[in-house]
Amino acid sequence: MATKKTSQAGKPAVIGRLMPAMRRSSAAGVLHGQAIARKVGVNSSDLECLDLILLNGPSTAGEIARRTGLTSGAVTGLIDRLERLGLVERTADANDRRKVLVRVREDKIGPIGALFSPLEKSIGAILAGYSREELRTLLDFFERSGEVLLARVAELNDGK
């Protein structure tokens, strides 16, 4: 059985390989998103914002601006474009009628989801090869690194 000392010996080398692997994966994800956006007929930023709304649920324009760092005018243009395509709708907030929420029209995004389906199947096949504990480790890593990324985005948007 490996001791903690011997199991840690190669850790810097693995981390050294992980960092560029993460960058390559991130770049590949961006390129995949751009290819999907071209197929759908939207720009890649609009597609990413659509996904953020889908992930976060109905959102106000202000919430979208805070999450993305876009100006209020840019967010209005984004919502207008997505609404023209029938992908989102503006609705009054049931709890505060003064608020307008942007909701993804899930009945209209099926064709976009279908474009992501082959990737989801391929990634699912890779994930199936990991143990439950390894999957928990991956989940922990992605949740924590996602938080770090969003914090850095907020810092950059605040001029830091």
Regions inferred by a protein language model and the residue ranges of each:
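N-terminal leader segment of winged-helix/HTH proteins
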Residues: 1-40
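A structural signal for well-ordered alpha-helices, especially hydrophobic packing surfaces
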Residues: 26-29, 127, 146-150
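C-terminal regulatory/oligomerization modules of transcriptional regulators
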Residues: 1-9, 132-160
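Charged, amphipathic alpha-helical coiled-coil/dimerization segments
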Residues: 83-136
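Canonical helix-turn-helix DNA-binding module
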Residues: 58-100
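N-terminal helix-turn-helix DNA-binding core of bacterial DNA-binding proteins
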Residues: 32-71
